[in-house]
Amino acid sequence: EIRIFSRDEKKQDDMRQFYKNPKIKYFIGDVRDRLSIDNAMKGVDYVFHAAALKQVPSCEFFPTEAVRTNVLGCENVLDSAQFHQVKKVIVLSTDKAVYPINAMGMTKALSEKVMVAKSRNLNGSGTVFCGTRYGNVMASRGSVIPLFVNQMKSGQPITVTDPNMTRFMMSLES
């Protein structure tokens, strides 16, 4: 069984219509709400924690919301997973958590620190917390590629914040 836990009802409905698979179960909830996580977490073996506020401007304008989702939400997922004896939780992070210069990177770096600290206190519970950092995934929501393409198509200059900046790109192709 695969469980989808998200606060986005529309995306869940789109997935339900597209996949039409009785082995996929859908749970409406928010990582900020531990009780809704607990409801979905019962009997789960593996968790891929991808919930985040990841748009840099949104996190800059609403840093408290970024902390609530990216840091406290991650803590809720980890606590629930440990309580329900999940085998492994994979926390998805970002390359922007390395030497962060904005609120999104800072909150993701802090969520990684929360994960590492909680890993030290698992006390042989059988649950494992691990994380991975993604760079710019081409064709993903929030990727800089569509912005660059739109700027080129409309004859605008490509916005580069620093000419010495390096961006790492990865594709979903194998």
Predicted features and spans:
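Conserved beta-strand scaffold in the Rossmann-like NAD(H)/NADP(H)-binding core
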Residues: Y26, V91, G131-R133
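Conserved glycine-rich Rossmann-like NAD(P)H-binding loop of the short-chain dehydrogenase/reductase
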Residues: E1-K11
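Conserved residues in the N-terminal Rossmann fold of short-chain dehydrogenase/reductase
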Residues: S6, F27-I28, R68
